[in-house]
A protein has these predicted regions:
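Active-site-adjacent structural segments surrounding the nucleophilic cysteine of cysteine proteases
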Residues: 1-14
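Active-site nucleophilic cysteine motif
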Residues: 12-39, 43, 57-58, 62-66, ...
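Active-site or metal-binding loop neighborhoods of secreted/extracellular toxin and effector enzymes
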Residues: 131-173
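Generic recognition of cysteine residues
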Residues: 18-20, 53, 76, 112, ...
Length: 173
């Protein structure tokens, strides 16, 4: 349910119920970028399969982000995707990015890399009134350290993960 009045989200509900997605998108429950929650639990298997088939982390993130954007737009009809070049200084902007780390074992006999460990996460940030803020998991809302989040290079470092995929932008309709 859409609710941009943050006091209703963060004072009426326990803070732990809201993550980066619920904060940025204005929903009152923990937000996952999937239509069916079971889909998110299968994500690691999909990542492993793509990696075994020779895809690198960057390509895997881009494939996942395409699915996520479709799901986000389906779940949140009050927002639209916007190209970075069309963003105006007064727009309230939501930015979305992924992090992915894969550690694997190389098997020379099969000439394959087997993923032993996969760590994947998503993150949203929002710019309102020219200020970028975020909410990491069940933590407090905070102002982003670096306010130049239109940079595609580098990472969004939340202290937990480094988000390095391309950035997807949304705005409220």
């Amino acid at each position: 349910m859409y609710n941009r009045v943050l006091e209703n989200i963060f004072w009426a509900e326990p803070r732990i119920r809201c993550n980066c997605g619920s904060y940025a998108l204005g929903v009152d429950t923990w937000f996952w970028p999937v239509v069916n929650r079971a889909e998110y639990s299968m994500r690691e298997d999909e990542i492993r399969s793509l990696y075994i088939c020779g895809e690198n982390e960057e390509t895997i993130m881009e494939k996942i982000i395409v699915k996520d954007v479709s799901n986000i737009l389906e779940l949140c009809p009050w927002i639209e995707q916007i190209d970075r070049s069309k963003i105006t200084p007064n727009d309230t902007i939501i930015a979305y990015r992924l992090a992915l780390t894969i550690e694997g074992t190389y098997d020379e006999q099969d000439d394959c890399m087997y993923p032993d460990w996969v760590d994947e996460d998503f993150h949203f940030r929002i710019r309102e009134n020219g200020v970028w803020t975020e909410k990491c998991g069940s933590g407090e809302i905070q102002v982003c350290d670096d306010q130049n989040w239109f940079e595609e290079e580098g990472c969004w470092d939340t202290g937990y993960m480094c988000y390095t995929s391309s950035v997807v932008y949304f705005r409220f309709r």
